């Protein structure tokens, strides 16, 4: 008993805290021990150091937390603590790791949280069973090298004064958690990539400028590098496929930008994957795909529902306020343009390869050129009208052509500086030259004995090549003869057609002078008929009825009157586009309407686009005065085009004045671009008849440009409103006239017809104007 009392007195002398009342010398407080589970209960505050040592000898758990000890208790020498596995010396005033604790060879967990430790002795190497070490909230400036030779699994060194990590940190092969947050670390050594078992890495609140790329080789689950000076996340971090939590707030990040980082981990890794594809464009497809994540369902803000983390893909809501001002909002609205560019590049690449290998590649499709497979044939053959349509500028007539054909023409015009459908002479010349090259390269003189000694398969191949060449030569010769025949017949028909035109103009003038200008059917005259199909002997020149210069000859050109001359025979046909190019036209007079008989017989007309082109061209010519045509039947096409262009400009100017006057707005110089989204036109329709367009898609400050789908919806709503108000169908423009800015003249006709149906505006009251002079006189 005396010895026990002496130990208690010595412990009390070592303890510098207050002494409990009643003579109890073990009144030191004992707080909870972080890292070692729940601390002792309230009754432990009165336990003596001696009882703590006795319990450590029995249980193997030493708890001396919160006793303000400056050194290890000396009474520990009286107890066998060699089997201690867990030691809690936190919340004391120790300046170094006690030497007594370094001899606990069975120690697995050591907690030195919140002390004054500045040095770790080398004797710590004796703790070869230590797996958990908490030295946070101390005054360490460096981690000693010998600390990296321990079998640690958890190392917590936060809230110290560390300026760097030792390169030997890579020796901690079994380390799963490393916490060095709240220090002054400026760089992380590349050897951290050797920590093949690391799962949790926390470098929060340091002075890091960059992240080591070697960290991408570590199977991290949690990464926290917030509150640093990091500007770029390495692209290789996309390989962190096991990462579930990444915390990166309070960093001046530039790549990925902040708009992507706030959306969460999924978007960050998508961005890194896209950047990797840009850096290495030759990556195979399977490496371009984003890597999967193992059980990866958490985001940056775990309490936030995942549905709110919208990527913005396919988002066309113009009122969305999630986008920042400097983030592109119409990044995906031009997807068709990107697809078109990709298709163009692929096509050009294929054609260049074909041109290089053209002389050495055997064609097996019966003598047809390989590049002709890329041509979308219309009416089963390629015509001169098609070639001319490709070469004409954008101001060509689009009213008579289908949208599919116009898209086809535009695609060919963009993808080729020179049209792949070459003129006949050039195309045949190239075929002949290719055949000559092929013949010189492949026809090598051989001896008959060698031919007999060749295997049968080789002989069959040679015979097939010869037959193929013969078929190609025959087809070329046949095509050449047909082209020459077509050219001769074209000249003859051109002469005959001019004579027919003069006679028809004279007949029309006589008929107009003798008949009432009202619409009537002259007796004995049928409607104007057109050939239902082209001549069978032509392949490269389509021969149609040339109605150029005939005002009143065509059923479409003379809408108030019927045609007055007999149908033309099939041989009296000529290429319309060769003499008069088609131009984009508008209907000038809203009072014109098609005859009922023409509408009844409309399904019997041929469906060829060439027929529609001829009809449209003659509709343009029909607006000229018959007297002028009778006096000068052979008018210069250039003058007609110039005249039509001037009329179109007048219509466009009139359209601008109408809109500005009705809506009290000032339109920009580019009127077509101002009307493309359909907003102005929808407001104009509502001005004529309120609520005729119930909903209008308008731009917003966040999304200043409407998507093509919303622009088309506005335009279609405007045209529907025009139909409901009463605009005739023949005066309605097409949506592509507005969306593609290719038919402002037709839009002007539609707007003019719409405004004619508007109620007359009441004149402003005159009373204030009459009183104004009286007031000024007073």
Swiss-Prot record:
<dbReference type="InterPro" id="IPR036872">
    <property type="entry name" value="CH_dom_sf"/>
</dbReference>
<feature type="repeat" description="LRR 2">
    <location>
        <begin position="81"/>
        <end position="104"/>
    </location>
</feature>
<feature type="repeat" description="LRR 9">
    <location>
        <begin position="240"/>
        <end position="264"/>
    </location>
</feature>
<feature type="repeat" description="LRR 5">
    <location>
        <begin position="152"/>
        <end position="172"/>
    </location>
</feature>
<dbReference type="GO" id="GO:0005737">
    <property type="term" value="C:cytoplasm"/>
</dbReference>
<comment type="function">
    <text>As part of the DISP complex, may regulate the association of septins with actin and thereby regulate the actin cytoskeleton.</text>
</comment>
<protein>
    <recommendedName>
        <fullName>DISP complex protein LRCH3</fullName>
    </recommendedName>
</protein>
<feature type="repeat" description="LRR 10">
    <location>
        <begin position="266"/>
        <end position="290"/>
    </location>
</feature>
<feature type="repeat" description="LRR 7">
    <location>
        <begin position="197"/>
        <end position="218"/>
    </location>
</feature>
<feature type="compositionally biased region" description="Polar residues">
    <location>
        <begin position="514"/>
        <end position="523"/>
    </location>
</feature>
<dbReference type="InterPro" id="IPR032675">
    <property type="entry name" value="LRR_dom_sf"/>
</dbReference>
<feature type="repeat" description="LRR 1">
    <location>
        <begin position="56"/>
        <end position="79"/>
    </location>
</feature>
<comment type="subunit">
    <text>Component of the DOCK7-induced septin displacement/DISP complex, at least composed of DOCK7, LRCH3 and MYO6.</text>
</comment>
<feature type="repeat" description="LRR 6">
    <location>
        <begin position="173"/>
        <end position="195"/>
    </location>
</feature>
<keyword id="KW-0677">Repeat</keyword>
<feature type="modified residue" description="Phosphoserine">
    <location>
        <position position="608"/>
    </location>
</feature>
<feature type="repeat" description="LRR 3">
    <location>
        <begin position="105"/>
        <end position="127"/>
    </location>
</feature>
<feature type="repeat" description="LRR 8">
    <location>
        <begin position="220"/>
        <end position="239"/>
    </location>
</feature>
<dbReference type="Pfam" id="PF13855">
    <property type="entry name" value="LRR_8"/>
</dbReference>
<keyword id="KW-0433">Leucine-rich repeat</keyword>
<feature type="modified residue" description="Phosphoserine">
    <location>
        <position position="415"/>
    </location>
</feature>
<feature type="modified residue" description="Phosphoserine">
    <location>
        <position position="625"/>
    </location>
</feature>
<feature type="repeat" description="LRR 4">
    <location>
        <begin position="128"/>
        <end position="150"/>
    </location>
</feature>
<dbReference type="InterPro" id="IPR001715">
    <property type="entry name" value="CH_dom"/>
</dbReference>
<dbReference type="InterPro" id="IPR001611">
    <property type="entry name" value="Leu-rich_rpt"/>
</dbReference>
<feature type="region of interest" description="Mediates direct interaction with MYO6">
    <location>
        <begin position="382"/>
        <end position="642"/>
    </location>
</feature>
<keyword id="KW-0597">Phosphoprotein</keyword>
<dbReference type="GO" id="GO:0032185">
    <property type="term" value="P:septin cytoskeleton organization"/>
</dbReference>
<feature type="modified residue" description="Phosphoserine">
    <location>
        <position position="419"/>
    </location>
</feature>
<keyword id="KW-0963">Cytoplasm</keyword>
<dbReference type="Pfam" id="PF00307">
    <property type="entry name" value="CH"/>
</dbReference>
<feature type="region of interest" description="Disordered">
    <location>
        <begin position="511"/>
        <end position="536"/>
    </location>
</feature>
<dbReference type="InterPro" id="IPR003591">
    <property type="entry name" value="Leu-rich_rpt_typical-subtyp"/>
</dbReference>
<dbReference type="InterPro" id="IPR050216">
    <property type="entry name" value="LRR_domain-containing"/>
</dbReference>
<feature type="region of interest" description="Mediates interaction with DOCK7">
    <location>
        <begin position="56"/>
        <end position="290"/>
    </location>
</feature>
<feature type="domain" description="Calponin-homology (CH)">
    <location>
        <begin position="645"/>
        <end position="758"/>
    </location>
</feature>
<feature type="modified residue" description="Phosphoserine">
    <location>
        <position position="324"/>
    </location>
</feature>
<feature type="region of interest" description="Disordered">
    <location>
        <begin position="758"/>
        <end position="778"/>
    </location>
</feature>
<feature type="compositionally biased region" description="Low complexity">
    <location>
        <begin position="768"/>
        <end position="778"/>
    </location>
</feature>
């Amino acid at each position: 008993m005396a010895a026990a009392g002496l130990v208690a007195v010595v412990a009390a002398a070592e303890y510098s805290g207050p002494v409990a009342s009643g003579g109890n010398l073990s009144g030191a407080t004992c707080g909870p021990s972080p890292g070692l589970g729940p601390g002792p209960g309230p009754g432990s505050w009165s336990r003596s150091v001696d009882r703590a040592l006795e319990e450590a000898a029995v249980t193997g758990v030493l708890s001396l937390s919160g006793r303000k000890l400056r050194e290890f208790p000396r009474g520990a020498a009286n107890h066998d603590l060699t089997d201690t596995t867990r030691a809690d010396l936190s919340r004391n005033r120790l300046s170094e790791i006690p030497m007594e604790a370094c001899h606990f060879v069975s120690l697995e967990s050591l907690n030195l949280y919140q002390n004054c430790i500045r040095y770790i002795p080398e004797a710590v190497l004796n703790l070869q069973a230590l797996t958990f070490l908490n030295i946070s909230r101390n005054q360490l400036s460096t981690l000693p090298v010998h600390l990296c030779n321990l079998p640690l699994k958890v190392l917590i060194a936060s809230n110290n004064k560390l300026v760097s990590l030792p390169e030997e940190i890579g020796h901690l092969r079994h380390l799963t958690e490393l916490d060095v947050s709240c220090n002054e670390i400026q760089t992380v050594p590349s050897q951290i990539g050797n920590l093949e078992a690391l799962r949790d890495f926390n470098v929060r609140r340091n002075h890091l400028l960059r992240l080591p790329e070697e960290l991408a080789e570590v199977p991290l689950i949690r990464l926290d590098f917030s509150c640093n000076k990091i500007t770029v996340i390495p692209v290789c971090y996309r390989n962190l496929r096991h990462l579930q939590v990444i915390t990166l707030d309070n960093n001046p990040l530039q790549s990925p930008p902040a708009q992507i980082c706030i959306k969460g981990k999924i978007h960050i890794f998508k961005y890194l994957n896209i950047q990797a594809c840009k850096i290495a464009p030759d990556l195979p497809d399977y490496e371009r795909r984003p890597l999967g994540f193992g059980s990866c369902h958490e985001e940056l803000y775990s309490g936030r529902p995942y549905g709110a983390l919208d990527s913005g893909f396919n988002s066309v809501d113009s009122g969305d306020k999630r986008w920042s001002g400097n983030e592109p909002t119409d990044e995906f609205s031009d997807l068709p343009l990107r697809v078109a560019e990709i298709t163009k590049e692929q096509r050009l690449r294929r054609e260049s390869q074909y041109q290089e290998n053209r002389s050495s590649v055997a064609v097996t499709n019966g003598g047809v050129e390989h590049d002709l497979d890329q041509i979308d044939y219309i009416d089963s053959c390629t015509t001169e009208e098609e070639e001319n349509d490709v070469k004409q500028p954008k101001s060509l007539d689009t009213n008579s052509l289908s949208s599919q054909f116009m898209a086809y023409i535009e695609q060919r015009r963009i993808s080729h500086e020179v049209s792949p459908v070459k003129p006949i002479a050039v195309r045949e010349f190239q075929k002949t030259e290719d055949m000559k090259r092929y013949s010189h390269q492949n026809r090598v003189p051989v001896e008959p004995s060698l031919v007999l000694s060749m295997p049968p398969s080789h002989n069959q191949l040679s015979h097939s090549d010869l037959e193929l060449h013969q078929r190609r030569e025959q087809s070329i010769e046949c095509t050449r003869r047909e082209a020459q025949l077509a050219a001769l017949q074209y000249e003859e028909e051109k002469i005959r057609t001019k004579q027919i035109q003069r006679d028809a103009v004279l007949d029309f003038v006589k008929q107009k002078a003798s008949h009432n200008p009202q619409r009537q059917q002259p007796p004995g005259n049928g409607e104007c008929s057109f050939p239902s199909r082209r001549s069978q002997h032509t392949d490269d020149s389509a021969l149609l009825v040339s109605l150029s210069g005939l005002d009143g000859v065509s059923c479409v050109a003379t809408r108030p009157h019927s045609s007055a001359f007999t149908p033309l025979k099939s041989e009296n046909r000529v290429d319309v586009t060769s003499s008069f190019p088609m131009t984009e036209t508008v209907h000038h007079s809203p009072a014109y309407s098609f005859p009922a008989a023409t509408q009844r017989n409309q399904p019997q007309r041929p469906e060829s686009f060439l027929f529609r082109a001829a009809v449209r061209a003659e509709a343009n010519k029909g607006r000229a005065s018959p007297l002028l045509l009778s006096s000068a039947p052979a008018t210069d096409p250039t003058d007609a085009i110039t005249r039509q262009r001037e009329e179109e400009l007048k219509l466009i100017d009139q359209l601008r004045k109408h809109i500005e006057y009705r809506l009290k707005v000032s339109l920009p110089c580019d009127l077509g671009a101002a009307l493309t989204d359909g907003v102005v036109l929808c407001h104009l329709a509502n001005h004529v008849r309120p609520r005729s367009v119930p909903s209008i898609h308008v731009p917003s400050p966040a999304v200043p440009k409407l998507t093509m789908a919303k622009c088309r919806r506005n335009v279609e709503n405007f045209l529907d409103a025009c139909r409901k108000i009463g605009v005739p169908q023949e005066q309605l423009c097409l949506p592509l006239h507005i969306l593609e800015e290719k038919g402002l003249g037709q839009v002007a006709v539609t707007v003019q017809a719409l405004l004619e149906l508007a109620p007359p505006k009441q004149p402003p009251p005159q009373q204030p104007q009459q009183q104004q002079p009286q007031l000024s006189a007073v």
